[in-house]
Amino acid sequence: MPITRMRMRPWLEMQINSNQIPGLIWINKEEMIFQIPWKHAAKHGWDINKDACLFRSWAIHTGRYKAGEKEPDPKTWKANFRCAMNSLPDIEEVKDQSRNKGSSAVRVYRMLPPLTKNQRKERKSKSSRDAKSKAKRKSCGDSSPDTFSDGLSSSTLPDDHSSYTVPGYMQDLEVEQALTPALSPCAVSSTLPDWHIPVEVVPDSTSDLYNFQVSPMPSTSEATTDEDEEGKLPEDIMKLLEQSEWQPTNVDGKGYLLNEPGVQPTSVYGDFSCKEEPEIDSPGGDIGLSLQRVFTDLKNMDATWLDSLLTPVRLPSIQAIPCAP
């Protein structure tokens, strides 16, 4: 039959209220805040009756230490007490008030309101899940690289590798081979057939493609321009001058040349007067006026210089004068 013992929270309250352990006191009893002396034995040295009396009392209460049967081990007592405090759901550490250094190091805790039954169940299930996850991590960490390599070397591969391929792919491959027609082997002959490419010879230039042609010159009757019309007038005048017969005459002691056949000089120049005729709106009006001006100039000129000009006169050098129609 198991021995029943007091839980840690009521046992701790009883130890604080007894004032038998030095340093274990209430800081704020209303808020259930208390402190525990937490001196480091390795740095400052321990006094079992003073610094480790709370941890020893808890070891005696849990049955892990009995006076006279085991050697005292204050470090183990302190570690067991710390684990028990951290596992309590209704006690938490106030870290901003704790002092972890020096000979007067203390830890401050707060007692929370008691948990209900449902809260205790949730807390228990959470702790069990944490324990399982820790165990899994520990088992994974224990496996060394040597054991992993040994497992790989001991594993044997099967001789039949057909199971590695996908069955569907093999079926598709068989269907494709069935649909593909069988190719007959190609026979290579040493004789090659004669073949040629028809080549059409094209001349280098386009002169052979078209016959040489000369454009006909335009006839004089078809290609008449204004310049040709102007050139005809002097030619006609020259012909008239060549056909006409120039006759010297003397009027009032002045010599003149007359080319009107059948007309006596006296009858012509006796009644000759320099009267301006009215302008005739005809194509030969300008020519008539020009001839009249020429005769007027000849009449007014001195006849003595004509004697020197009669012998060397050259008709082609005479200025062309348009005649009246």
UniProtKB/Swiss-Prot annotation:
Which PROSITE patterns does this chain map to? IRF_1, IRF_2
**Annotated DNA-binding residue span(s):** 5-113
GO CC term (a single one): cytosol
User: Which GO MF terms are attached to this record?
Assistant: DNA binding; DNA-binding transcription activator activity, RNA polymerase II-specific; DNA-binding transcription factor activity, RNA polymerase II-specific; RNA polymerase II cis-regulatory region sequence-specific DNA binding; RNA polymerase II transcription regulatory region sequence-specific DNA binding; transcription cis-regulatory region binding
Q: Which UniProt keywords apply?
A: Acetylation, Activator, Antiviral defense, Cytoplasm, Disease variant, DNA-binding, Immunity, Innate immunity, Isopeptide bond, Nucleus, Phosphoprotein, Repressor, Transcription, Transcription regulation, Tumor suppressor, Ubl conjugation
Sorted alphabetically, which InterPro entries does this protein's record hold?
A: Interferon_reg_fac_CS, Interferon_reg_fact_DNA-bd_dom, IRF1/IRF2, WH-like_DNA-bd_sf, WH_DNA-bd_sf
Q: Which positions are linked by Glycyl lysine isopeptide (Lys-Gly) (interchain with G-Cter in SUMO)?
A: K275, K299
Detail the disulphide connectivity of this chain as listed in its UniProt entry. none
Modified positions (N6-acetyllysine) in chain numbering: K78
UniProt subcellular location: Nucleus; Cytoplasm
Q: Which Pfam families match?
A: IRF
Q: Tell me, what controls this protein's activity?
A: Activated by MYD88.
Q: Where is the composition biased (Polar residues)?
A: 141-157
**What upregulates or represses it?**
Induced by HPV16 E5. Induced by HIV. By interferon (IFN). Induced by N-methyl-N'-nitro-N-nitrosoguanidine.
Modification after translation, per record: Phosphorylated by CK2 and this positively regulates its activity.
Sequence segments annotated as region (Disordered): 92-165
* SUPFAM superfamilies associated with the record: Winged helix' DNA-binding domain
Subunit structure comment from the entry? Monomer. Homodimer. Interacts with EP300. Interacts with MYD88. Interacts with PIAS3. Interacts with SPOP.
Query: What does the record give as the function of this protein?
Result: Transcriptional regulator which displays a remarkable functional diversity in the regulation of cellular responses. Regulates transcription of IFN and IFN-inducible genes, host response to viral and bacterial infections, regulation of many genes expressed during hematopoiesis, inflammation, immune responses and cell proliferation and differentiation, regulation of the cell cycle and induction of growth arrest and programmed cell death following DNA damage.
Q: What else is known?
A: Deletion or rearrangement of IRF1 are found in preleukemic myelodysplastic syndrome (MDS) and acute myelogenous leukemia (AML).
The record names the disease as: Gastric cancer: A malignant disease which starts in the stomach, can spread to the esophagus or the small intestine, and can extend through the stomach wall to nearby lymph nodes and organs. It also can metastasize to other parts of the body. The term gastric cancer or gastric carcinoma refers to adenocarcinoma of the stomach that accounts for most of all gastric malignant tumors. Two main histologic types are recognized, diffuse type and intestinal type carcinomas. Diffuse tumors are poorly differentiated infiltrating lesions, resulting in thickening of the stomach.
The record's family statement is: Belongs to the IRF family.
Q: What is this protein called?
A: Interferon regulatory factor 1
Q: Which organism is it from?
A: Homo sapiens
